[in-house]
């Protein structure tokens, strides 16, 4: 039985994907920070605030004692706050956001590296808004996602035994959008966009589609997906044409100024 560790399994994407993995026969291990999720009863869930080193060490130590070796790591951790123009934000909160959205996720993965199951393991992270344009008033969130994209490429380049890639799920109905509603006018144009989306019957990207994209990325191996950033909504993942293009262009779907 393959084992997946989901960081932030209490998040909507984390819990829904967790259940999909369980239904496909995976053993799911998850972490949460505040409230333990009740909608994924078959998962082994541990309280772990990834911004606290002691929590990380305790979590990793528990897995080690239970002789658990992971095959896949998926991080669903994230916050879009603080939402405001950069110089109007409280910088301490801004710094904490970068820590949650970027540094702390890498710290957990750094600790977990030695507990991998073998030579073919996968790490999947989540990209977000601002990859292709300014994400006005969401600077901490945006810069963290860009950093994660580059980190995927760096890990892929340094560790041939890992298939590390990142996906942008697109507009999905999750609790994260409530942070934008809370911010109100500070969110700028995105406030009305999110408000309209939440009131509509449109569910956005389905969790099933996000799941299928991840499975595709794992199956295709690092030569195709390693170090790259994929859009669940806009990219033609799953097609042979894209596979051939990726194999022939090592710079495709990565952060590049070249050819721009």
Where are the predicted features?
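A short, exposed helix-loop element centered on a Lys and neighboring polar residues
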Residues: 109-110, 153
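Catalytic loop of short-chain dehydrogenase/reductase
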Residues: 122-160, 168-174, 178-184
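C-terminal helical subdomain
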Residues: 166, 186-259
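Conserved mid-core segment of classical short-chain dehydrogenase/reductases
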Residues: 57, 78-95, 137
């Amino acid at each position: 039985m393959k084992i997946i560790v989901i960081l932030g399994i209490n998040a909507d994407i984390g819990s829904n994907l967790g259940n999909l993995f369980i239904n496909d026969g995976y053993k799911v291990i998850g972490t949460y920070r505040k409230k333990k999720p009740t909608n994924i009863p078959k998962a082994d869930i541990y309280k772990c605030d990834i911004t606290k080193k002691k929590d990380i060490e305790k979590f990793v130590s528990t897995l080690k004692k239970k002789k658990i070796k992971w095959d896949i790591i998926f991080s669903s951790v994230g916050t879009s706050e603080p939402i405001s123009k950069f110089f109007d934000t409280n910088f301490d909160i801004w710094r904490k956001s970068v820590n949650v959205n970027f540094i702390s996720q890498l710290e957990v993965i750094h600790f977990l590296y030695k507990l991998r199951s073998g030579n073919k393991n996968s790490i999947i992270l989540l990209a977000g808004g601002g990859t292709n344009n300014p994400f006005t008033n969401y600077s901490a969130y945006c810069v963290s996602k860009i950093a994660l994209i580059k980190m995927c490429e760096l890990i892929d380049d340094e560790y041939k035994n890992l298939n590390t890639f990142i996906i942008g799920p697109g507009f999905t109905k999750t609790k994260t959008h409530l942070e934008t509603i809370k911010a109100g006018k500070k969110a700028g144009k995105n406030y009305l966009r999110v408000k309209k989306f939440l009131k509509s019957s449109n569910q956005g990207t389905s969790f099933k589609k996000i799941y299928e994209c991840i499975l595709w990325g794992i199956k295709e191996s690092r030569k195709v997906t390693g170090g790259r950033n994929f859009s669940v909504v806009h990219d033609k993942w799953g097609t042979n044409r894209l596979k051939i293009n990726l194999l022939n262009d090592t710079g495709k779907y990565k952060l590049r100024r070249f050819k721009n």
